[in-house]
């Protein structure tokens, strides 16, 4: 198991009996080979290692597809895993309450505009509906004002004048530096809540929502536990 900042994975990371197989971006092929696995599961960041890992054992590639939507991707991934272990009947119960929770969020988001941003290295990058945080502008129903842009990796750097000009009802913020534990970085609030942003309706109405578990949004999107946490962040922020 590689090191992690995800709380619900810490017990595995800290378990000395579980072998460290590398990072989320680079597998330790020698360590994987020593484990003699029957099957290997990988996510999007390890896609370049697919061929090398396939020489060790069959590889199951699990990723999110923004064309299908995050929730459908999570369900599809869960069903793929469940089918391998004969646990198909478990998936529906695990996914059962997500639809109702999203419907409740939609009662708030209906007719509301939003900007979805990521703070990184002192900058504020805007995210569309084609990558990270797409849950907000797709399933959750907010009208993401930068939805049409291609922002699938780290978004497009934005000026705060643009934020003021678009004047959304809500601003959602993911703190990338916090997610990856960047030493000495400014926190998201220091970056976002400047004199320009304080003139927006979102600020005046207390509608700037800092996603509490940025590490989950940034590195763990695509799993059932991650989706539960992400929806909880939205629910708490929208109270």
Model-derived regions: residue spans:
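Structured C-terminal subdomain patch of bacterial secreted/periplasmic proteins
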Residues: 72, 83, 92, 170-239
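Basic- and aromatic-lined ligand-binding clefts that recognize polyanionic substrates
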Residues: 90-141
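A short, structured surface patch at a secondary-structure boundary
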Residues: 1-34
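Extracytoplasmic/secreted envelope proteins and their assembly/folding machinery
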Residues: 29, 33, 47-50, 54, ...
